[in-house]
């Protein structure tokens, strides 16, 4: 097989791109191939050896030279789509005759075997050829016609992690496959064919996955002219920037319902057309630090995991700009309050974040029922009214909350006087030893079960929940064990300021002393 500059190879399980073919000074008698490795750690230099520069690389020290014997070893393959299809779905045959025309091997099949194989192909609805060394989609029109004939019923095609590079050939290949709806070409380096890319009728494709293809917005803009009725588009981990992606407003199909642009270089949300029907948006693993400037009414699911959101008030901005939001992932952002980092997974913060949104019922993957949401809202309202949480009470969300819980704001003042507070939550002290100096303050709802309170305490103190007992001490110093894991703590007359003693094998003796009669 003859190789050209720009060809992709997989050698020993590692992918690379040929950047140079010729003779180099250290190997004057053999043909050398300069390659750039996808796994940059395998490189040894940047295309320069003995002070002679032979080729350029995108990432410093990601290049190396290989002898032709290494490149043309039996384990290095570049095959056609039809060959890969035959290997995986064609089955074995005892009626194959090996013929040779020049240097090309031709597979000869009996008519019965050929008809049976073609019949099997036509039954296929999904073809999965991920990592199958496919470098050539078709060699000529006859081969393309054979693919069209045999893959007529295919709806889902996975060609991810292969070796083809020409985008024009790819579009020409899939255009006649009119039943094809889902196409995955992720992790292919689409390096060529962009300059003469035609407009194709690829309106039958509804799902397109282009993750990790090294694409810029310039490439995406050209490609979307052919994919005009997409419902799902995955552009994650490419080379998209906020400057380029702002043009999405003019390029993105209005039919799109789900968009994944995670893992790029975005510092802001893209602009979208007003008539967009987008339901799901994933912008995780970017550098975004603020909400969109224009409301996006259609989005119901949003993933902003691992971005640069820092201020708590940005949660309220997201609620305003995504008014239909029902599902949000926002872990990995350094939300803070008074300079302190907030862990969204902590129960109190989880409740607060949930309550700040009008309609969210799934937070960081946790599905919340109506009861949980109501508890979160009660907790949040009480914290705000107790001046324990800074919140803009002029927001429409606050008006909605006080209306929902029939709170007469004219009878309340926001200060620290206990008599003005509404006791929707209880502040208790957790004591795991004899000394009050070790007490931990904890906010609970009266509806929290004993088991839930126990689990939170054990998580904070690193205790084993199976070996822990809780004891309630009221304001008069009376101590009683809290039993019945699935009853609410309100059943045990726990009120503000009470102490919950924790008994575990580590501190069991000290707790027994607390419980001893005087």
Swiss-Prot record:
Gene Ontology molecular function: alpha-tubulin binding
Entry protein name: Protein PAC2
Keyword Repeat belongs to the record: yes
A GO CC term attached to the entry: microtubule
Its job: Required for viability in the absence of the kinesin-related CIN8 mitotic motor. Seems to be involved in the assembly of alpha-tubulin.
LRR repeats: 153-174, 179-201, 204-227, 229-252, 255-276, 277-298, 299-319, 324-345
Taxonomic path: Eukaryota, Fungi, Dikarya, Ascomycota, Saccharomycotina
Keyword list, A-Z: Chaperone, Cytoplasm, Cytoskeleton, Leucine-rich repeat, Microtubule, Repeat
Additional detail: Present with 2140 molecules/cell in log phase SD medium.
Organism domain of life: Eukaryota
């Amino acid at each position: 097989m003859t190789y050209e500059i720009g060809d992709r190879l997989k050698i020993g399980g590692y992918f690379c791109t040929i950047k140079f073919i010729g003779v180099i000074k250290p190997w004057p008698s053999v043909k050398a191939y300069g390659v750039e490795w996808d796994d940059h750690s395998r490189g040894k230099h940047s295309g320069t050896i003995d002070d002679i520069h032979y080729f350029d690389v995108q990432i410093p020290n990601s290049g190396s030279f290989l002898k032709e014997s290494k490149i043309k070893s039996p384990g290095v393959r570049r095959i056609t789509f039809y060959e890969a299809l035959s290997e995986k779905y064609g089955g074995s045959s005892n009626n194959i005759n090996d013929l040779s025309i020049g240097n090309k091997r031709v597979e000869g099949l009996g008519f019965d075997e050929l008809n049976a194989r073609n019949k099997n192909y036509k039954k296929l609805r999904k073809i999965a050829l991920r990592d199958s060394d496919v470098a050539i989609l078709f060699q000529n029109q006859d081969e393309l016609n054979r693919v069209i004939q045999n893959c007529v019923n295919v709806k889902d095609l996975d060609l991810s992690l292969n070796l083809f590079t020409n985008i024009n050939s790819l579009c020409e290949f899939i255009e006649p496959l009119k039943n094809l709806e889902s196409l995955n070409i992720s992790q292919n380096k689409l390096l060529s064919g962009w300059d003469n890319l035609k407009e194709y009728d690829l309106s039958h494709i509804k799902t397109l996955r282009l993750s990790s293809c090294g694409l810029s917005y310039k490439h995406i803009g050209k490609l979307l002219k052919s994919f005009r009725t997409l419902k799902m588009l995955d552009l994650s981990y490419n080379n998209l920037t906020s400057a380029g992606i702002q043009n999405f407003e003019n390029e993105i199909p209005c039919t799109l319902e789900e968009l994944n642009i995670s893992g790029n270089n975005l510092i802001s949300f893209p602009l979208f057309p007003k008539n967009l029907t987008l339901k799901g948006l994933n912008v995780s693993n970017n550098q975004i630090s603020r909400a969109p400037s224009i409301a996006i009414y259609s989005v119901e699911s949003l993933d902003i995991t691992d971005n640069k959101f820092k201020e708590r008030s940005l949660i309220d901005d997201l609620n305003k700009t995504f008014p239909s939001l029902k599902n949000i992932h926002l872990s990995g952002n350094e939300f803070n309050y008074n300079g302190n980092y907030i862990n969204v997974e902590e129960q109190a913060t989880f409740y607060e974040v949930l309550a700040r949104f009008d309609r969210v019922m799934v937070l960081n993957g946790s599905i919340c029922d109506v009861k949980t949401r109501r508890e979160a809202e009660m907790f949040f309202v009480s914290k705000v009214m107790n001046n324990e949480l800074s919140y803009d009470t002029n927001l429409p969300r606050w008006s909605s909350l006080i209306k929902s819980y029939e709170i007469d704001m004219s009878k309340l003042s926001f200060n620290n006087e206990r008599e003005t507070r509404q006791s929707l939550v209880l502040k208790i002290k957790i004591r795991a030893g004899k000394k009050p100096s070790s007490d931990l303050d904890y906010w609970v709802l009266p509806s929290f079960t004993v088991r839930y309170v126990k689990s939170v305490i054990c998580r904070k103190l690193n205790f084993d929940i199976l070996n822990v007992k809780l004891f309630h001490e009221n304001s008069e110093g009376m101590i009683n064990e809290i039993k019945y894991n699935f009853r609410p703590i309100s059943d045990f007359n726990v009120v503000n300021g009470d102490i919950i003693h924790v008994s575990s094998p580590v501190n069991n003796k000290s707790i027994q002393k607390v419980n001893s009669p005087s």
